[in-house]
Amino acid sequence: HIHAQLVYRDASNFPLLGRATESAGARYERFPDSLKNISRAPLWNLSRNSAGMAIRFRSNSTTIAAKWVALFNTHMNHMTDTGAKGLDLYCLQKNGDWRFVNSARPKGKTNQVTIIKNMHPEEREYMLYLPLYDGLVSLSIGVDSLATISQPLVDYPIRKNPVVFYGTSILQGGCASRPGMAHTNIISRRLNRECINLGFSGNAFLDLEVAKVIAEVEASVFVLDFVPNA
């Protein structure tokens, strides 16, 4: 039995959902570089977590894999490593619902995981959620060498006028067992609308810098849930 080799494509080739600003210096960070020396240090460090972000792509591969390098290699005794620094793959169903496929469970800072294999080779729309309590140095998506991986053809979640959430560790995704189970990500799938997660663990202190980032977004709804920290 011949196994097709996997070919990895840099995830920066595909749409990134869940970022408030296009001026972030690093692709998987939530603040623009201009705030680096202005923000409080804990807030800046948390802004480098990729909470609420997801990659959208389309593929007919029988296998989907991922390679990624975590920014901080976060490990906490009250949250799973998969929730903190793992990935979560979902597939769009014909009825418009998103179905959980599997998680990419991290082993450490540098990871390579086959998320699913032995699928029928048909075109599917995918969404890959990024870590909630860590950032990414790099991310690439692996598919069969003879398969295609391309831009999504379906505008789900709808990106026009996203919902912007601001809040605490609860909102950032603590302590979801895997990235897709942060409540902003659940809401995004239920509404089929892009949600932007500006949750900052222990740091929802109504910083002016955050207000400036929020103000950049042509949002449909602003959800402000900072009271547990205030």
Go through each PLM region and give its residues.
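Conserved SGNH/GDSL esterase-like catalytic core that processes O-acyl groups on lipids
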Residues: 82, 110-113, 118-125, 131-140, ...
